[in-house]
Amino acid sequence: MADQPKPISPLKNLLAGGFGGVCLVFVGHPLDTVKVRLQTQPPSLPGQPPMYSGTFDCFRKTLFREGIRGLYRGMAAPIIGVTPMFAVCFFGFGLGKKLQQKHPEDVLSYPQLFAAGMLSGIFTTGIMTPGERIKCLLQIQASSGETKYTGTLDCAKKLYQEFGIRGIYKGTVVTLMRDVPASGMYFMTYEWVKNIFTPEGKRVSELSVPRVLVAGGIAGIFNWAVAIPPDVLKSRFQTAPPGKYPNGFRDVLRELIPDEGVTSLYKGFNAVMIRAFPANAACFLGFEVAMKFLNWATPNL
């Protein structure tokens, strides 16, 4: 690889990753709302059209019926959850890299970067699961016509009152199935594209803003190419009525495949891919900007 990195600071990764997560949510939440509504819409009755025919139809109907606020519905949950989640995510990646280095100047291979990314996926599941559970419930309730929860805190409170801590953490296993391999792909792809973009004799840290944006966007696409099938299972499982899937995601899979085919595992694909590039481009740019600021302001942190 072209760059000889500075000693890795997991703490700086933690702080810069939190800022990157905020950037991701602001850019990507509208299409995340569309994705969840497409993934959780019920099968259409014979002879009747589906509630949403696709990504743009869902976007248009949501905007028309609920305004711009409808597209940002449930955003408080990911802002509250995503900021620490991405902080922990980038911390886990930094720690994973540091654990594999014998010396600060060691340059990691791509399989080692993938392994470091997988560690970050394990770290983030504890934060990601309740945030995703609340977000999905808030996103689908408007399209169902039922208003059970008035907001993020109300949803968390009612889930805890009805089902305890297990109700808030419903979907932990399938979230792990999604995030561990997807996070490995995410960070490995970002480092790979950055190295491709780095001219001979230059350092990766000197990449221009457009190249950082493209590298982050491509990393987001590769991440979601791995994550979409378990994400569909997660969305269905987390928004299902209590007791509908007693055996977890396996019951969701048994219902989806016979009824809707293998393609049902890629519901919301267009919305995910349209969102993946700009949202993750913003995330990595935010991370890099914050990291440069921290390196300047606190070089010894």
From Swiss-Prot:
Gene Ontology MF, one: O-acyl-L-carnitine transmembrane transporter activity
Keyword Nucleotide-binding: no
Pfam families: Mito_carr
Gene Ontology BP term (one): lipid transport
Modified residue annotations for N6-succinyllysine: K170
Spans within the Cytoplasmic topological domain: 2-12, 94-112, 191-211, 288-301
Keyword entries, A-Z: Acetylation, Lipid transport, Membrane, Mitochondrion, Mitochondrion inner membrane, Repeat, Transmembrane, Transmembrane helix, Transport
Residue list for modification N6-acetyllysine: K148, K157, K170
Modified residues (N-acetylalanine): A2
Solcar repeat residues: 8-99, 108-196, 207-293
Residue runs in coiled coils: none
Residue intervals annotated with topology Mitochondrial matrix: 32-73, 132-170, 231-267
Entry membrane topology: Multi-pass membrane protein
GO cellular component: mitochondrial inner membrane
Entry's transmembrane regions: 13-31, 74-93, 113-131, 171-190, 212-230, 268-287
Catalytic reactions of this protein: O-acetyl-(R)-carnitine(in) + (R)-carnitine(out) = O-acetyl-(R)-carnitine(out) + (R)-carnitine(in); an O-acyl-(R)-carnitine(in) + (R)-carnitine(out) = an O-acyl-(R)-carnitine(out) + (R)-carnitine(in); O-propanoyl-(R)-carnitine(in) + (R)-carnitine(out) = O-propanoyl-(R)-carnitine(out) + (R)-carnitine(in); O-hexadecanoyl-(R)-carnitine(in) + (R)-carnitine(out) = O-hexadecanoyl-(R)-carnitine(out) + (R)-carnitine(in)
Domain of life: Eukaryota
Location(s) in or outside the cell: Mitochondrion inner membrane
Role played: Mediates the electroneutral exchange of acylcarnitines (O-acyl-(R)-carnitine or L-acylcarnitine) of different acyl chain lengths (ranging from O-acetyl-(R)-carnitine to long-chain O-acyl-(R)-carnitines) with free carnitine ((R)-carnitine or L-carnitine) across the mitochondrial inner membrane, via a ping-pong mechanism. Key player in the mitochondrial oxidation pathway, it translocates the fatty acids in the form of acylcarnitines into the mitochondrial matrix, where the carnitine palmitoyltransferase 2 (CPT-2) activates them to undergo fatty acid beta-oxidation.
PANTHER family assigned: MITOCHONDRIAL BASIC AMINO ACIDS TRANSPORTER-RELATED (PTHR45624), MITOCHONDRIAL CARNITINE_ACYLCARNITINE CARRIER PROTEIN (PTHR45624:SF56)
Family stated for the protein in its record: Belongs to the mitochondrial carrier (TC 2.A.29) family.
Protein name, UniProt field: Mitochondrial carnitine/acylcarnitine carrier protein
Organism expressing this protein natively: Macaca fascicularis
UniProt gene name: SLC25A20
